Amino acid sequence: VTTFHDVTFYNDSKATNTDSVVKALDAFDKPVILLAGGHDKMTPLEDFMNIVKSHTKEVIFMGEAADRFESVAVKMGVQHIHRAQSMKAAVALGYQLAKAGDIVLLSPACSSFDWYSCFEERGEDFKNCVRELEERG
């Protein structure tokens, strides 16, 4: 999406399953703040959360999947777990937690149907929230 204040934002809203998120996380060699959640597909999460634990510095869960994601993440030893009640709040929190060189990645591991009609709409909301944040400086 964009980079400002040396924090890079990536829109991977199309990542609607855990395998896609793992591939996205594997692509980065910098610290990642992961924004995940949405309509819960009720897939097993233990292996996924082990990858999240080793590939992220912070995790922000949102949407209807947030409760289950957080519960499994805690069980699997994931540290630095946060919650957001909206995309705008998730983007703002991701930026607040980031340091220069970090990545804020929207890669939900869920479908979008709890808050949005499709993954494209979710991705557009993410991009708009990032632009708003950038405009505020």
Where are these regions (language model features)?
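Residue-level signal for inorganic ion chemistry
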Residues: 12, 34, 59, 106, ...
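Phosphate- and divalent-cation-binding pockets in alpha/beta enzyme and binding domains
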Residues: 20, 68-71, 115
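Nucleotide phosphate-binding/pyrophosphate-handling subdomain across enzymes
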Residues: 1-56
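Glycine/aspartate-rich loop-and-adjacent alpha/beta segment that forms the canonical ThDP
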Residues: 109-136
